[in-house]
Amino acid sequence: MILIITLNPLLERRFTYEQIKSGSVNRNAETRIFAGGKGINVSRQLKKFGLKSYNYLFSGGTNGKIHRDALKNEALDFTFVSTKSETRHAAVVISEKDKITSSFFSEDPIILQTEVDEFKLKLDKMIQNCEIVIFSGSSPSIETDSIIPYGIELANKYDKVSICDTYGNHLKSCVDAGPTMIHNNLSEIIKSFNFNIENEKSIIEFLNHLYHKNIKRVYLTNGSNNFYASNFDYIYKIKPLAIQEYDATGSGDSFVAGIVNGWINSDLFEDSLKFATATAALNAATFDVSNVNIEDVIKIKDKVEVLPVGKKTKTIDDSPREI
């Protein structure tokens, strides 16, 4: 089972206009209720790849009820811990002609310590029964900052694969807990760790720093720019595809889904990188969020350049041959 943890889900009310006139009344939008949150995006993209996942989240109030109904409408499996605070929500306004998306978020919910304790209790049992656990998205309050490090420690205890894709004040504690893999945007790392990462040398030093913390795979994406990844102490530079970007929302989550797809299918590291990078690019080329077709990924993934930095791995062809 693929288990996905989302501490801060998002109820989106999406308004799509042909074109927006700023400072004026804009009418006749196409409206849609949408289940958001980084982990939910990962789950949606995995479903497009034919992989079933199970979501575990906080949910509260009227917004939480509407969010859960949206999950049911998408046939995304989930369970939740109820909160007294409302699930956060956002208005997402799209101007199609201008290719502009604007998002307006509410404040994050305050999660009570009793709700955190209940979440952790159930999390222990769920991690025991999964193959891989993904911790995705932000922590909504100080009380929830301990959940992801705790979950990573559980995954290590039960010998499960863990992927950490979070940011904020708790990120250092998450890294110190030693997840199997980490995905982060480079700007998030710089902000969370207060590191001065200016060039390839400093990025390589940081990747080696994480490797010595027993983190096996690291992905430091950087929007549409070249980025770096590591597989143990082997480091790669990746050149993403040049695309016309519409909305990059969910591209990081689609990337994570691509990495999970590669792990489940036992793909070579470089192949999984190409697949994940192509998925992220295709996501950014549409106003949809994490809804990329696998056939489209397969068509373009080999156009992604993956270049080794430093020592190179040797690929052994062990396919059967006639004697």
What are these regions (language model features)?
Residues 1-21:
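Positively charged, low-complexity intrinsically disordered leader regions
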Residues 27-87, 300-303:
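Substrate-binding N-lobe of the ribokinase-like
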Residues 93-129:
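Conserved phosphate-binding/catalytic loop of the ribokinase/pfkB sugar-kinase fold
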Residues 110-112, 139-143, 170-172, 245-246:
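Short, small-residue-enriched loops and turns at beta-alpha junctions
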Residues 130-140:
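Short acidic, glycine-rich surface-loop motifs adjacent to enzyme active sites
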Residues 146-233:
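Conserved phosphate/ATP/ADP-binding segment of small-molecule kinases
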Residues 172, 200-323:
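Conserved phosphate-binding/catalytic region of the ribokinase-like
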